[in-house]
UniProtKB/Swiss-Prot annotation:
Subunit (UniProt): TFIIF is composed of three different subunits: TFG1/RAP74, TFG2/RAP30 and TAF14.
GO annotation (BP), single: transcription initiation at RNA polymerase II promoter
Localisation per UniProt entry: Nucleus
UniProt cross-references to SUPFAM superfamilies, sorted A to Z: Rap30/74 interaction domains, Winged helix' DNA-binding domain
Cystine pairs: none
Phosphoserine found at: 28, 34, 56
Region (Disordered): 1-47, 165-194, 366-400
Keywords per UniProt: DNA-binding, Nucleotide-binding, Nucleus, Phosphoprotein, Transcription, Transcription regulation
Molecular-function GO terms, alphabetical: DNA binding; nucleotide binding; RNA polymerase II complex binding
Name this protein carries in UniProt: Transcription initiation factor IIF subunit beta
Acidic residues: bias regions: 33-47, 386-400
Any further remark recorded for this protein: Present with 520 molecules/cell in log phase SD medium.
Annotated PANTHER family: GENERAL TRANSCRIPTION FACTOR IIF SUBUNIT 2
């Protein structure tokens, strides 16, 4: 397999992207459009048949019956074959095909670089291909001669580059002015109007002829992959792993409170436990109700009423019911209640033992009064019933 058939030359849109050569004063070899030349559409061949170079329409079909394979190469192999040292028609490798056509192998020459695999598996991705061709194009002899002269003289090439930059700036200004004057008259049907109302003109250039030829007709589309049996295959895999490691995504690392290591250069606000750095949570709703301090006597009476309802209260619950500042509420709580530290009612307040006794005595006294009232009412009811029975037992006599 030679380099000419392995890599297809790039296609060039020759008919649409072309310029004309300026008649005088052009030492750079670049093609410019002079003011004296007539501007015409190089794509409109029917109306400008006599003005187009005949060479630009010639297509070499000598190798049109030649069958070529369109191959997709790995990046490292394509870069090696793209080197100019490998583009002199020398043999790059051989293709080995089994008799039944089940396996196709590409073998590179042994004298090539040992850093890449020499054995590849070639897979047919599309066996039958229609209407695909490979083209090549070259400059005509007069343009090739100018190119060789510039390559032979570096100083002349440098002057040509500087001259090219100056002429490009001048050419842009002249072309813009010329288009505004002439293009509207000659190509009214080619003028387009943008949304902002300004006219936009399609650029018209003169076609530069190229020597175009068909390299061959594509008959198969293939893909080349390194063979796992090749000893250099593991080198390619290792290179890819290193590329992946170097291109890792950025990670977010949270700061820990390790004294003298990660937090040594941070401020006091970052080191304290109250820091909100990287903390996720909902913001607390701000209460618009302001707490007004009540007299201690009223708070104590209200606390006794609350402890009559439930024996155990949390500080949060008492604060919601009393609506007092926490410091003021704690000061009053410490006088009548104690905080439970263990058990099922841990971290809740309950009345002190002495107040519990008074509470029980008051409850018993209240229950005793209720019992006496119930007993007195029961005696009155019994006496009334006895008097009613006596009245029933007295016999009444009729007086005549």
């Amino acid at each position: 397999m030679s380099s000419g058939s392995a890599g297809a030359p790039a296609l060039s849109n020759n008919s649409t992207n072309s310029v004309a050569k300026e008649k005088s004063g052009n030492i750079s070899g670049d093609e410019y459009l002079s003011q004296e030349e007539e501007v015409f559409d190089g794509n409109d061949i029917e109306n400008n048949e006599t003005k187009v170079y005949e060479e630009s329409l010639d297509l070499d079909l000598e190798r049109s019956n030649r069958q070529v394979w369109l191959v997709r190469l790995p990046m490292f192999l394509a870069e090696k074959w793209r080197d100019r040292n490998n583009l002199h028609g020398q043999e790059l490798g051989k293709i080995r095909i089994n008799k039944d056509g089940s396996k196709i192998t590409l073998l590179l020459n042994e004298n090539d670089n040992d850093s890449i695999p020499h054995e590849y598996d070639l897979e047919l991705t599309k066996k039958v291909v229609e209407n695909e061709y490979v083209f090549t194009e070259q400059n005509l002899k007069k343009y090739q001669q100018r190119k060789k002269e510039l390559e032979a003289d570096p100083e002349k090439q440098r002057q040509a580059y500087l001259k090219k930059q100056e002429r490009e700036e001048e050419l842009k200004k002249k072309q813009q002015q010329q288009k505004r004057r002439n293009n509207r008259k000659k190509f009214n049907h080619r003028v387009m109007t943008d949304r902002d109302g300004r006219d936009r003109y399609i650029p018209y250039v003169k076609t530069i002829p190229k020597k175009t030829a068909i390299v061959g007709t594509v008959c198969h589309e293939c893909q080349v992959m390194p063979s796992m049996n090749d000893p250099n295959y593991h080198k390619i895999v290792e290179q890819r792993r290193n590329i992946v490691k170097l291109n890792n995504k950025e990670r977010i690392t949270t700061l820990d409170e390790t004294v003298g290591v990660t937090m040594s250069h941070t401020g006091m606000s970052m080191r304290s436990d109250n820091s909100n750095f990287l903390k996720v949570g909902r913001e607390k709703a701000k209460s618009n109700i302001k707490s007004i301090r009540m007299p201690k006597k009223e708070i104590l009476d209200y606390l006794f009423k609350l402890f009559d309802e439930y024996d155990y209260w949390s500080l949060k619950g008492l604060k919601e019911r009393t609506r007092q500042p926490e410091a003021h509420l704690k000061e009053c709580l410490d006088k009548v209640a104690t905080l439970v530290k263990k058990g099922p009612y841990a971290f809740k307040y309950t009345l002190r033992p002495e107040y519990k006794k008074l509470k029980e005595e008051e409850r018993k006294a209240t229950l005793g009064e209720l019992a006496d009232e119930q007993t007195g009412s029961a005696g009155d009811n019994a006496q009334g019933d006895a008097e009613a029975d006596l009245e029933d037992e007295i016999e009444m006599e009729d007086v005549v």
